[in-house]
């Protein structure tokens, strides 16, 4: 049974619908962000949940709901573990203390829970394709609502995300993607795309040019000045990054912007929402912002159980977990057999392959959120005499069924698939059950 609802702070407690949010002066929105963070930290200390990701999207969520009006407009969150703030801003703040509890709010977006949850999820790489389908349906029906896909940079390591990007420009003229770049999935992001996004963030040349023009543009004021600013930024960026990835997919790129600057986010979203071309807005956020323990340990606070608000400490388990036993045992085996390799898909700490990574970095491979590639990569290793161990959560291993059957089993390749989190997952719910174990 759920506990009584705690009293909400003043601004947050006043929001029950879009009109209530619009009544709050823009100057007060940073205070609303503080109230949301405080409520999340206090509530999740009891229930557990995905604290770090949600602390990182507070300002983005506020800006989205100031500019767009759900449920008419559609906001689709990739994975949707970062949708807690969205729920709080759409009439569910008083229930946030029930998140991931029996008969409480789901820890993910859920269509049956609220009409504001346009699309349910739980796995990565789904938002862009689903949003594109909604855009196609809107266009076919002659309707005029906005569709916004919100995806973390880790989702761009998914093949499905790249498949969606490849289809956007030929499907619709009105499509908005927000790339929430915090450099993390569950663990630190890996691969060429992660390096590419970082290069966009840290270009000293572009940052210098943008800073030099900012004061001049602010003095101009008005709509024309705003349009000039966006055009100037786009032109400058294209000179510095002539082969900008998203331009090649037919998307107009904006950013990178400070994802914690509410006024800038609101101005930018208001500008791009009426463009007659597909756009991608790249924002940079800090996972765990507002809670020092989450900033110090982003992996731990990606998702966890109850914790002490004061220091973020969690209650330790009296006995080793199955994952810990698996990780340490594989390290012991690898000491005796140099052909053993370990593969994971952005979940080194969860599967405890971080122990293997520390002991044998050259034989450890993190493929990012690309389970299918990881399975096929393991098949290639096995075909050449190596002994690959693929450690992936059971719920994500479902994506590898074809590779397990067609590539590993049919060819009798000795790939060891090690499924973590087997069986039922009561906290995360049906999207994370290991139903096929």
Stretches found by the model and what they are:
Residues 2-90, 245-267, 272-285:
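N-terminal amphipathic, basic-rich helices that act as targeting or association modules
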Residues 158-180, 190-203, 294, 387:
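A short alpha/beta connector and helix-capping loop motif
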Residues 79-84, 151-158, 179-185, 287, ...:
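Acidic, glycine-rich active-site loops and adjacent beta-strand->loop/helix elements
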Residues 93-109, 170-187, 205-208, 365, ...:
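A glycine-rich helix N-cap at a beta->alpha junction
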Residues 38-45, 104-120, 142-148, 354-368, ...:
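Glycine/charged-rich beta-loop-alpha catalytic/anionic-binding loops adjacent to active sites
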């Amino acid at each position: 049974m759920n506990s009584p609802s705690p009293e909400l702070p003043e601004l947050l407690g006043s929001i029950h619908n879009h009109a209530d949010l619009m009544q709050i002066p823009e100057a007060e929105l940073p205070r609303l962000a503080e109230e949301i963070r405080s409520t999340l930290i206090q509530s999740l200390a009891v229930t557990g949940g995905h604290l770090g990701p949600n602390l990182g999207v507070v300002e983005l969520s506020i800006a989205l709901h100031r500019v767009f009006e759900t449920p008419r407009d559609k906001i689709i969150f990739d994975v949707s573990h970062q949708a807690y703030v969205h729920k709080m801003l759409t009439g569910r703040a008083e229930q946030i203390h029930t998140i991931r509890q029996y008969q409480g709010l789901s820890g993910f977006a859920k269509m049956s829970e609220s009409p504001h949850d346009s699309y349910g999820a739980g796995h990565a790489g789904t938002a862009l394709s689903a949003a594109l389908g909604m855009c196609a349906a809107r266009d076919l029906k002659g309707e005029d609502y906005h569709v916004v896909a919100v995806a973390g940079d880790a989702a761009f390591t998914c093949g499905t995300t790249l498949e969606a990007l490849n289809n956007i420009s030929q499907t619709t003229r009105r499509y908005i993607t927000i790339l929430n770049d915090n450099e993390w999935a569950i663990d630190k992001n890996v691969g060429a795309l992660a390096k590419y996004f970082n290069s966009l963030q840290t270009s000293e040349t572009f940052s210098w040019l943008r800073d030099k023009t900012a004061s001049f543009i602010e003095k101009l004021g008005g709509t024309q000045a705003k349009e000039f600013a966006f055009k100037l930024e786009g032109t400058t960026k294209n000179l510095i990054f002539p082969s900008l990835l998203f331009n090649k997919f037919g998307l107009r790129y904006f950013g990178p912007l400070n994802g914690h600057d509410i006024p800038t986010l609101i101005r930018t979203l208001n500008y791009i929402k009426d463009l007659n071309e597909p756009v991608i807005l790249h924002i940079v956020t800090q996972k765990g912002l507002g809670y020092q323990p989450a900033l110090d340990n982003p992996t731990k606070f990606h998702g966890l159980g109850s914790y002490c608000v004061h220091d973020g400490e969690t209650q330790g388990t009296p006995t080793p977990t199955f994952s810990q036993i698996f990780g340490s045992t594989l390290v012991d085996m690898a000491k005796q057999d140099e052909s053993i390799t370990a593969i994971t898909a952005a979940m080194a700490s969860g599967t405890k392959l971080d122990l293997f990574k520390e002991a044998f970095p050259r034989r450890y491979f993190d493929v990012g959120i690309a389970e299918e590639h990881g399975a096929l990569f393991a098949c290639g290793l096995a075909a050449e005499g190596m002994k690959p161990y693929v450690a992936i959560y059971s719920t994500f291993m479902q994506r590898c069924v074809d590779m397990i059957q067609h590539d590993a089993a049919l060819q009798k390749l000795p790939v060891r698939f090690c499924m973590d989190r087997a069986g039922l997952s009561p906290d995360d719910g049906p999207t994370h059950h290991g139903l096929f174990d």
